[in-house]
Amino acid sequence: TSKEQLANMMVGRPIQSELPRAAYNPGAEVLKVSNVQLKDANGVALLSDIDFTLRAGEVVAIAGVSGNGQSELLEILSGMRLPTSGKVEFLGQELPYAGRANADGLPAAFRKLGIGHVPEDRLRDGVIKDFSVMQNTVFGYQDHVKNRWGLFDFKKIAQRCAGLMQAFDVRPNNPDLRIGLLS
């Protein structure tokens, strides 16, 4: 079986094997990962000597067999996990891993820098299934929906939720619906 036949069988239709390539003009360096390593609690290496640079306009895929560290690398890049060693720079600024005992507060700090994270399994890791759509829109943005006394401002929460539901065409348009019922 040729590569082309195998690819056609995988997608269920003939595919174009040669795609026209646009000129490659890499932009400024956006993300630089240098010698990132991660060990588990027993000292077993989960990531070893990870090095790469991402430039503006590039699309990079991190691929591998399940269990080979892709998820762990993305968790490091989004501040959800600390590397054992190494350095990560975003827009020329070193990300603040050093001197920390844990990753508490890093995801919020990274969001302020413009770094986001879309989990592999959004129902397992991205939402609380038994909470409403509106309640789930608060997570990670608590400081933006509080009133002057530091309490949640439910009008702001409802406005934020309505805006997100409209922007992403969430159906049915019911902010009180349990998010675990959505597809």
Regions found by a protein language model. Name each.
Residues 1-183:
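Glycine-rich phosphate-binding loops of nucleotide-dependent enzymes
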